[in-house]
Amino acid sequence: MDLLSALTLETWVLLAVILVLLYRLGTHRHGIFKKQGIPGPKPLPFLGTVLNYYKGLGRFDMECYKKYGKIWGLFDGQTPVFAIMDTEMIKNVLVKECFSVFTNRRDFGPVGIMGKAVSVAKDEEWKRYRALLSPTFTSGRLKEMFPIIEQYGDILVKYLKQEAETGKPVTMKKVFGAYSMDVITSTSFGVNVDSLNNPKDPFVEKTKKLLRFDFFDPLFLSVVLFPFLTPIYEMLNICMFPKDSIAFFQKFVHRIKETRLDSKHKHRVDFLQLMLNAHNNSKDEVSHKALSDVEIIAQSVIFIFAGYETTSSTLSFVLYFLATHPDIQKKLQEEIDGALPSKAPPTYDIVMEMEYLDMVLNETLRLYPIGNRLERVCKKDIELDGLFIPKGSVVTIPTYALHHDPQHWPKPEEFHPERFSKENKGSIDPYVYLPFGNGPRNCIGMRFALMNMKLALTKVLQNFSFQPCKETQIPLKLSRQAILEPEKPIVLKVLPRDAVINGA
């Protein structure tokens, strides 16, 4: 007998009731935005609006802004997400209500010991880490690190010279990825790694494995859709980060700590040593204690995780723009030559004071901020500028969309470093330009990242010019990943400085 015809009326009724209950369960929060008249794409039961992310976060946010205006509602699974483009509201979230309501970032799954990282930690724990780590990023400390980073700039120049001699196009991410890796491993752990020439080095391999991330990874997606799975995964010892990489760094930090206990190492300037020395001046015992081994590992790993992609991708984007805008490339080289005649070695003060270099880097970060969004979790009910945001909701600030808003940036898709000249910079609203966030929980490594990128650009542009080639994708198209990166690797021709620039 056919299975369907064998089902009784009572069974059909029961199935219908179950389906209705499942539908109600999967849509029970969908009224949050309707009640306030907040527009947004139609969510699906349980999934919410996450399927739209396949377009790429930046592109999707741009579409939503054009369609719905400065505020719209999304659902990541069943988590309500308030997307805001209003600058006063952004200021309230990032600054005014930071400590009271919007202190924390969203959980993104079972992270193991990485829950101790400064960018992941919450409330008082985050405050303690921030206070302990902030002295590591003062201008004085950065000046001490500058010579360490400069030696990797020299290695970068040497490698590019070899590539230029072959006449073959160069993949920017490969070159600057290796540079970023070397700088971060050296400044984080005091380890000298030549990633370009030793890609099989265990430190390089474990770090690269750590950096692999996909927004549509089943584990990550399952936590986005069903946050209640996170504690279950943690009980099962399942982690978003590769365990062998974390174990490798745990062993390494423990070994290094043992060798650095004597006083002769206390004047080293890598982050690991500075963290070993770190103490908070607070009289409170909990916040006064130095970082534990686990906490040091978490901070070291997050420095790598955050710094590698930011530096390598941004440098690749900068050189793409310079190659396709030869007049801007020439003007920047003239500034560098004027500040450092006859290819003089750069110094911290000279590099950080170059105005046009700063303008070029800022405009690149406007067009291509590495993070498509900034997010904060609402930890208690609040009414913000007439908008009710319930506890547990997420507020997202679509950075990419803000940076491309024609209301704030005339001809936003065009590359114009003059937007950030001394004459124009003062008129820029600080809440429409957010490559490193803003407020108490902005990127703690911002100054280090800027110094690192400016030094690399200075060394490279002292020696080379860059041109598009047939492999260069023009115009550049972006991938659909959560982290902003090109659809195809940026490939450019590298020429010694005495070559003529014929850029497209």
From Swiss-Prot:
PROSITE patterns: CYTOCHROME_P450 (PS00086). It comes from Rattus norvegicus (Rat). This is Cytochrome P450 3A2. Its main location: endoplasmic reticulum. Belongs to the cytochrome P450 family. Expressed in liver. Keywords: Endoplasmic reticulum, Heme, Iron, Membrane, Metal-binding, Microsome, Monooxygenase, Oxidoreductase. It is a peripheral membrane protein. Heme binds at C443. Its cofactor is heme. It catalyses: an organic molecule + reduced [NADPH--hemoprotein reductase] + O2 = an alcohol + oxidized [NADPH--hemoprotein reductase] + H2O + H(+). Pfam families: p450. Induction: By pregnenolone 16-alpha-carbonitrile (PNCN) and dexamethasone. It comes from the Eukaryota. The keyword Cytoplasm does not apply. One of its GO terms (biological process) is lipid hydroxylation.
